[in-house]
């Protein structure tokens, strides 16, 4: 099994060079913000939910391998999605702090939303915000000095798209 399912920054193809990327959906998982003790910020993770269909990106590790992706996804563990013949990363419970709400880096969210907009359009962005839980984490505006290591350059329209959805929360 060499394919993975990305539901956050891996949806944005500017952040990686894995093979054969294509938009896809999986059923039975919901996305949520969790506090990471490794990164000292909020990260996206998933948990089981029979009612949810999650949009994301499927790609193959054949060209770079799992080791490089495992390193990128430090603080996550791989989980097999046997019904889909692929794997995805889930926030490692050992490194998640449920007692505190660490901040969501705006540069991270911008990167994620840029990917969703490019591959799923405005409706995909809307679904991302609606299908993601734990928006009660503070937002850290680091756009002028991005802390996210794979921050991307957004258009004014994309910045506004993120800001408009945050205002509606």
Model-derived regions: residue spans:
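A glycine-rich, hydrophobic/aromatic-adjacent loop/helix-cap motif
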Residues: 2-169
């Amino acid at each position: 099994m060499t394919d993975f399912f990305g539901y956050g920054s891996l949806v944005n193809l500017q952040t990686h060079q894995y093979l054969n990327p294509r938009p896809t959906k999986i059923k039975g998982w919901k996305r949520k913000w969790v506090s990471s003790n490794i990164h000292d910020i909020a990260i996206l993770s998933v948990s089981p939910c029979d009612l949810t269909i999650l949009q994301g990106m499927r790609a193959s590790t054949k060209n770079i391998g799992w080791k490089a992706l495992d390193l990128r996804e430090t603080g996550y563990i791989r989980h097999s999605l046997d019904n889909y013949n692929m794997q995805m990363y889930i926030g490692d419970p050992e490194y998640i702090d449920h007692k505190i709400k660490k901040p969501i880096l705006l540069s991270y969210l911008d990167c994620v939303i840029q990917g969703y907009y490019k591959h799923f359009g405005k409706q995909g962005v809307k679904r991302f915000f609606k299908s993601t839980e734990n928006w009660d984490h503070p937002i850290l505006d680091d756009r002028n000095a991005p802390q996210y290591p794979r921050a991307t350059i957004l258009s004014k329209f994309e910045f506004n798209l993120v800001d408009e959805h945050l205002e509606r929360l």
